[in-house]
Amino acid sequence: LCLACDDENKAFAIGFKTPPADSTGVFHILEHSVLCGSAKFPVKEPFVDLIKSSMQTFLNAMTYPDKTIYPVATTNEQDLYNLMDVYLDAVFNPAIYTKPTIFEQEGWHYELDLPESAEGEGDGSPASLREGTLRYNGVVFNEMKGALSDPMSVLDDAVNAALYPDTAYAHESGGDPRAIPALTYEQFLDTHARHYNPSNSYITLYGDLDVDRALAFLDERYLSQPSAASRRMDAAVAAGEDPSTLAPNPLGVQAPVTCEYKRVEMATTPENALVGLGLVLGSALDRKRTIAADILFEALLGSNEAPVKKAILAAGLGGNVVSYT
């Protein structure tokens, strides 16, 4: 998609359809991991280097429940090509295929907590090692431990799982700390190979730029070239794997469901107890219905003077009421 205009801000984004099949957070871990070096840019943290050295006005990567997006923006056209080069090499030729430690660092690994000696530190002796406690660690693992310590996040996951039990939305795309350690390195690589390819991507260009030059750059440098992911896929086909198992995860379609009641217990104080009501309002493609729902819920619950919220608070049924669509 090319959105040519006279805005001096020039932007590029590549997105991949990444509906999860479980709650291991594989796509969240991939989002972190591909930005830990690539074939053309074998540095430890290219993302950090770009923040320091480029003229970027926006630089990020985001994992959603059904897609992963890598957007960049800058006011300088040549800088845009530099940013595109780094990001495209990161997503198509990441260092994850040659450096398993990236998966362990960003996803999960075992770590031994040693007991403190008399001097206050584990002495590393055989006895100390035997008494040590093995625990999980990892960037995404710890990030999601923090995210899911919020009762609102736990409630949101429970509502989605109840409303969309047969689809990708039943899973925690960011990763559930209880499920993340079930993800293996081979599954991690296979998931990248199946999803991070041009046929499963969508590219957007925006701003005052030479569209023909940009398209030629994309095609010549990456879209028409073999990638680390495509080479792994070719090897799998050559080894006799069923091609149908190599396709990206489907989003899934389900029949209407009714879930009258579901309780989720969490180690928290009674003051943090929550109750939620979820409704499936139809397809997201029905834009008029979506906008109407936004307006309706804003009118009913959008402020302390909104009628439904005001009535609930006045009745003492809760300390706060929120809604979102």
Task: Name every feature range the model reports, one short phrase each.
Residues 1-8:
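N- or domain-start disorder-to-order transition segments that initiate the globular core
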Residues 8, 23, 286-287:
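Short glycine/serine/proline-enriched coil/turn segments at secondary-structure junctions
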Residues 8-14:
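Short, conserved catalytic-motif segment at the N-terminal edge
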Residues 15-25:
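Short pre-active-site segment immediately N-terminal to the catalytic Zn-binding motif
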Residues 17-19, 33-250, 254-258, 263-292, ...:
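Charge-rich, well-structured scaffold segments of protease-associated domains
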Residues 26, 30-34:
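Active-site His/Glu-centered metal-binding helix of metallohydrolases
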